[in-house]
Amino acid sequence: MNQKQHKRSAFSGKIGFVLSAAGASVGLGNIWRFPYLAAKYGGGIFLLIYIILAFTFGYTMIVAETALGRMTKKSPVGAFASFGKTGGLSFGGWINAIIPILIVPYYSVIGGWVIRYLADYIGGHGSELAADGYFSAFISSGPSAEICFAIFTVFTLSIIFAGVRNGVERVSKVMMPILVVLSVVIAGYSVTRPGALEGVKYFLVPNIANFSWMTVVTAMGQMFYSLSIAMGILVTFGSYMKKDVSIEESTENVEVFDTAIAIMAGLMIIPAVFSFSGGDPDTLQAGPALMFITIPKVFESMGLGTVVGILFFTLVLFAAVTSSIALTESAVSTFEDELGWDRKQATILIGIIMLVLGSLSALGYGPLARFTVFGMQFLDFFDFLTNSVMMPIAAITTCLLVSRVIGVEKIEAEVTLDGKPFRRKRIFNFMIKYLCPIFAAIILVSSVANALGVISM
């Protein structure tokens, strides 16, 4: 490893960290995945379980990863290696570092889809987006999907070139407040549609009759998507955090911000779908197709559908961008630390990786459709590998590092550097030692079992 030293970047303060970390968390996992999972797994009961997990499981992992990063001032590989270079510790650091490198290419492909939809709405082609077969025709087109992916990738890389404070932080400070305003406006419009209040009730009021074990497992899995845990981002962002910034308060800000946006996303989509379909179960459980196939049909049935479509896909684009720059920044930080490269060199390398792996996903439903990995298209395979296998393993290794190697006392010392008490210390200690690794193991086993057809999620 090249040990050439470089001056470590830093956020300007608490607001910079919170908005950047919230930007990393508030991505397609909130706007796209959360609403369709809530619709599929019982609405209000899913939301209740998710909130409980966010303020226990999610909170613990955010504190642990952020403290680990700030304590070592290193990206995941170096952070883990700071406490020993045994095989297990080295593996934990590398798996946390590799995850964003594998996610951001296919994530950028989906970001490219969002660009295409936004452009079509701006061009007044909303009725075409609502037509049957539009989405499948677009993603199988090859060149069109590749161009949109390339545009999104270049935009992401241009922000990373600008650095942590002038790029990641500045963009997050601009986009996140706009995202909040757009979510409130769209949710307000959605819940006032005829028949939408039934959707509000379904989403917000827990119904124990809708409870199942899979509701809990799925809500656990959503934690990884929604809070950006176990993918190296929070370790990296923690390494950019100043010592006088409160880790616990910042974590609370991030979890509240993230959960609020997830709820707003549910209020944007579920009531609108109820208004459109009358609560038809098949429509509610459309899964990933909900945003790109069902929602355009919903907007087409509304008054001001084109305007709402523009606002909605602008919001989704902002969410995708803030998350993609966080993923890319984590990868760049790893290359800088482990290879001793400067930001320009590291950004060019991740750019090449994004274009190569992303092109496989962008073309995987078209010219490369006949090539699959374990029966999955490239995008689906990378998504399964990272989110269902690698991230739970990364979470387990982080829990073991903190609880068995570093010791919770050192984490507490890092958290209280600002002079304030660690208010949820008991919850943190219990979760990181016992429940968090168990939860991560459950997610890993259930995800693999689902892929093998043993269970159905």
Predicted features along the sequence, with ranges:
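Membrane-interface "cap" regions at the ends of multi-pass membrane proteins
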Residues: M1-W32, M61-T66, R70-F83, G87-F91, ...
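Helix-loop-helix connectors at the membrane interface of multi-pass transporters/channels
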Residues: N2-K4, G78, G111-S140, M241-D244, ...
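Inter-helical loop and helix-membrane interface segments of multi-pass membrane transporters/permeases
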Residues: Q5-R8, Y36-Y41, P76-I95, S108-R165, ...
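Extracellular loop-to-transmembrane helix junctions
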Residues: A38-A64, S144, M390-A394
